[in-house]
Swiss-Prot record:
This is Putative pre-16S rRNA nuclease. It holds the Pfam family RuvX. Keywords: Cytoplasm, Hydrolase, Nuclease, Ribosome biogenesis. GO terms for biological process: rRNA 5'-end processing. Could be a nuclease involved in processing of the 5'-end of pre-16S rRNA. It comes from the Bacteria. The lineage of its organism: Bacteria, Bacillati, Bacillota, Bacilli, Lactobacillales.
Length: 139
């Protein structure tokens, strides 16, 4: 079963994919979006769904530290509903608290990547962490 992990932001969607057995997650790419213009990167997402024969989506939910939901949670759920209807695939959600922080820490401490380069990969790495956390908890 191939699962696609998504880190949905207001400007980009980080994309990760599981291996065919569902053991490991790998970051794929960052899709630019523009919420205000109604551009959600769905065409590119569709290309990736076909290329990787995706069976399911996992979307990170950016809950607050006190477990409450804010506007980004609602935006992520709306994105999930949109892609579920468009692609006819199930969508699960994964708590993503601190995944971007963890991704940034990994890039700084382990890879010593500059700030400008981090911006180019942070969402992809966050999507990978979201998906890997999901795989570790569910398979």
């Amino acid at each position: 079963m191939r699962i696609m992990g998504l880190d949905v932001g207001s400007k980009t969607v980080g994309v990760a994919i599981s291996d065919p057995l569902g053991f490991t997650a790998q970051g794929l790419e960052i899709i630019p979006i523009h919420e205000e213009k109604g551009e959600f990167g769905l065409e590119r997402l569709g290309e990736l769904v076909k290329e990787y024969k995706v069976d399911k989506f996992v979307i990170g939910l950016p809950k607050n530290m006190n477990n409450t939901s804010g506007p980004r949670v609602e935006a992520s759920q709306a994105y999930g509903q949109r892609i579920a209807e468009l692609f006819g695939l199930p969508v699960d959600y994964q708590d993503e608290r601190l995944t971007t922080v963890a991704a940034e820490r990994m890039l700084v401490e382990q890879a010593d990547i500059s700030r400008s380069k981090r911006k180019k990969v942070i969402d992809k790495l966050a999507a990978q962490l979201i998906l890997q956390n999901y795989l570790d908890r569910n398979f």
